[in-house]
């Protein structure tokens, strides 16, 4: 009997609703807010946002802001930093060819009465700061307030390599879009991808020609542009038109008050936007001027300039800030050691004060050597000295050998007698010696007859072997001695991979796509060669009981390239120690300094003095060991816009942190719970892949952009530095497959087409088998002489099942090209 339950009728009791009292509930406050909540920094409570601040609260908030600014100023003085921070680097980038970046720059400069062509003031204006001593006319510095300055740059093209160089050092990016072409094209999408892959700086969207749109459609057009922009940059809400002077003033106010995002990988290293450079021919020293940004700089460090290489620092000088608003604002407490710096590129002004911040001896500087020169005799046994050879001759034992035996043949005979037995043998009677000599002669005659018979048998065997070779030649079968040279060429090693890559270049893209599709459908499956024994063809491969847990010695059979690279005993400990060295470095951020580079790049000076540069030049201070070569691993993902195939060991172009170079990575799948990673032939889309190269050591974090060539026309993949570890094992897997020829019983079957020689079956007999339907088994014995074998499995077999065998070998990336700038010896 079911349990009776009461069901209320129409006249059921109605209780009173809950009354929260004078305060509102969280849900009521949230509904009233309607999502119009703007938070700065940490997340705030909804109840706190719902309270309207009165005058006392607003006054208290203002006092806290003033106090925080005073504390910040005191902290800067305590650390020895200048009163004014370095100018904010603002870059103008267009998103379509119809956009006019020159007009945007002209409007911003005309607001301060600056001429865009000359960069000079049309009227006297203290608020405008223009560096007239710069070699590069692309730099224009403007003082927005007494504390905030702006350095305005213009990216004149949409070339990806130019956009990357500007984005790497920009604090604020002004993206310019044309209202007549509101939809983003593929190039604009890739520019957004490039910016996001390098960590997003502060971004403002500028809309041009919005005044040409009908008034009724302006709001709708602006909302559509804003929705697209917020999709790529959800934390950047600033989308502003800029067609009038009032709108230009609004943009400047946002630039002045907007919070600048900190980019971690850029902040941890000292870097400088080179504003001026000169060459001293007497000492072959190149000087570069600019603001130190990011971290502290020491003269012990190595300076890296993209496209030019690494250089040592002779000294670092503190000079007057040429962008200062008023000379009275700047006071140099360290006014000693001021002198004139006569350079080949021009003389310094007499009123500028120079103070040497840091200068170290040559022995204390980091070396420029990037790789080790391996010694091929390192693993060889040391040759014995003359004294050791004399001891060997003195202790050399005498052997009893048949008469007529040569010194080479005497080494075949074992010497099991002791020294005492030899002495006793030498002290025996002459008669005994004669008897033994007679016996020795008889033995010699018998041995000569036996050796003669053996020689005849060998000759007969050679004749038979020649006959077999002759018959096999007509059958298409090669003898083992004949295929030795071919195996050296066809073996699955690095040389073979390179040959395959050269052949793949001749293949058209359709064939490469077909190979990639086959790799997706049938991963790692290979055909067993019929004319070469598998035990020789796959001699470098091995079987593993478990890919995850089976041991593999990381120091086993390493290539000669591993003798050239550097390895850390503890990478994290070395990284922390290298970063801690810069804590007490004398050159602080926001200081305007002059760096003297030993044997600096003269081409840099010539380029800056002959023409207006299309991209800015930057100098980066490297940590200790960051110019050494090691094995680097990157986490990458193929970009959806790149449809062509990318093979392992195919040359691509890396934009890696501040560096850029050509390299040939190998790809693998990362397994977090395994000490071995599986090699991938292709960089497949929609899959997180690891790329491994020989490259300069870099402490993470560091972003990565991969292009198909040095011209950077097409973006291949994006990623970041994962680790620096030469002990990471990357295994190439091949799968040998066979089909079931006959079922002997439920668990015993005959397998064919996996091998073609019974010797190969015995060679790989201990390797575990499995099927595509989940059965596991092993080889029992070969059947016949044509490669069939009897196998046993753990369950009933299906006749349509496929038998597989996994074999593995360790692979390594290609070494850096000899003409690369990454290889350098002192």
Curated annotation (Swiss-Prot):
Keywords tagged on the record: Nucleus, Ribosome biogenesis
Compositional bias (Acidic residues): 416-434, 441-467, 491-510
Molecular function GO labels: GTP binding; GTPase activity; U3 snoRNA binding
GO biological process, one term: maturation of SSU-rRNA from tricistronic rRNA transcript (SSU-rRNA, 5.8S rRNA, LSU-rRNA)
Main location: nucleus
CC per GO annotation: nucleolus
UniProt-recorded name of the protein: Pre-rRNA-processing protein TSR1 homolog
